[in-house]
Amino acid sequence: MKKNRLLFRVIILLILCGAVGFTLYQGFFANKEKMQIGKEAPNFIVTDLEGKKIELKDLKGKGVFLNFWGTWCKPCEKEMPYMNELYPKYKEKGVEIIALDADETDIAVKNFVNQYGLKFPVAIDKGQKIIGTYGVGPLPTSFLIDKDGKVVEQIIGEQTKEQLEGYLKKITP
């Protein structure tokens, strides 16, 4: 009887481990295959919190730092002030920073933007359609897009001010 109970528990544990492993694989690895470095960045249209329409293809000729984030994400919260500090300098040089929130409420995002005094365009990815198109897994995830609209690099995780400045230099036209 005890042997059967132990065997049953081991089988259940293996099934649970397999399910967790598959979920982690889907979340962290499978999505990354969708976006290829060197390929044209998929176009999108969003409206930022100021009511301005942003279409990626309209930004050709500029470098674009495309950041996917969430208000609940502590690493995202840490890097936002660096992006805000560097934005004016690199905007003058032809680089645009666009922050796309992962489908949270307008109020939550506006409160976050006001709290940090963010000056760069912030929009909400309603229904996470752009996140799906770009194959974003964990947040924060950023894409470097060059002046020709090609994806130069994908960065997953929090960035220091120095790292962020290096990335912005990399896509300066």
Swiss-Prot record:
An example Gene Ontology molecular-function term: disulfide oxidoreductase activity
Record Pfam families: AhpC-TSA (PF00578)
Residue ranges constituting the Thioredoxin domain according to the UniProt record: 35-173
Keywords, sorted A to Z: Cell membrane, Cytochrome c-type biogenesis, Disulfide bond, Membrane, Oxidoreductase, Redox-active center, Signal-anchor, Transmembrane, Transmembrane helix
Domain of life per record: Bacteria
Keyword Disulfide bond: yes
Disulfide linkage: 73-76
Pathway it works in: Protein modification; cytochrome c assembly
Record's subcellular location: Cell membrane
Entry protein name: Thiol-disulfide oxidoreductase ResA
